Amino acid sequence: LGKIEAVCHKVAEFIGTRARQRIGSDRIEDGKVVMSRMAGALVRAILVAMMVAMPSVLLVDVTTDTQQMVALVAIFAAALTFVEYNAVYPGLVEFRDAKPFNRVRFLMLLTTVIFLSLIERGRMAPTTLTELTEAVGTLIGASMDFPYSPVRLARLMVTDGANEVQAHAVRTAAGMAYLISLLSMALFIILLRAGAWPRQGTPFNVWVNLPTFEPSAGGDVVDRLNRDARINIALGFLLPFLIPAVVSLSSSGFAPLQLTSPQTLIWTMTAWAFLPASLFMRGIAMGRVASMIRDKRRESAVPAGPFLPA
């Protein structure tokens, strides 16, 4: 009996040790996940702050008040990004786990801001790089400036009293921004077709990636996703044409004095090209999610046969 009790004690000690080791390893893994998420959120916040401050860094003759305002906006954007990506549960950012979606959008936004900032810098402190960028932008703007094109309609935001230099600056910035948005959408579609997202065999959480979408609001989820996808794609296609028309009808357009501000021109043309492309990509992503759910339902459906189970 003594030997049996000794063996039982050893088994109990072994099981307890394994349980404690398992709990310790789980805590270590949880700590690694938290640190990894925090590091990723910090890197994203720094990149967003750099993107917001990029025009003020590249441009010359920026006033102190403008620098302070831009720094405040950059800090706010960085804090919002850090809080959003460091949180366990989603808040406002959609497709948080869809790497191509947000990365392509950020790359599009950053590239547009950099190229437009280089073009505007070349008007004050020309260099070889700025002259090359402006020449490419001028060529793109001229090639896209045909009747009823988005670039032609973007010039409606300029008042009739604006001189030729201001109209040329708007056309160059609009052409460059619109081309970058088209290339970004093409890159996003290529990544989807190549299978980079969503990957086969990986779980997809609709709530994490679509926090503002309510699956239990009523109706079939697939039909609602397809409907929202069509609406986003339609808005993404129409907004480059509607925004200049709305601005032209609601007011007399931007005053020529405001067009002399490089940062106003940079952020206006960036938003004009980024918002439609972002809606277009959102519609494509939602359509892809709807097709995923439809395929999962088809795979989990019981195949019809001549006999029914008892």
Give the residues covered by each predicted segment:
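Juxtamembrane "helix exit" motif at the C-terminal ends of alpha-helical transmembrane segments
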Residues: 56-60, 239-262
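Long, highly hydrophobic alpha-helical transmembrane signal-anchor segments
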Residues: 90, 99, 104, 122-185, ...
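Alpha-helical transmembrane segments and their membrane-interface junctions
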Residues: 119-135, 234-252
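Transmembrane alpha-helical insertion/packing segments
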Residues: 29-94, 100-129
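Alpha-helical transmembrane segments
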Residues: 67-73, 173-192, 270-274
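Loop-to-transmembrane boundary segments
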Residues: 33-42, 217-240
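Juxtamembrane inter-helical linkers in multi-pass membrane proteins
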Residues: 197-221, 295-307
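Alpha-helical transmembrane segments and their immediate juxtamembrane interface regions
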Residues: 251-298
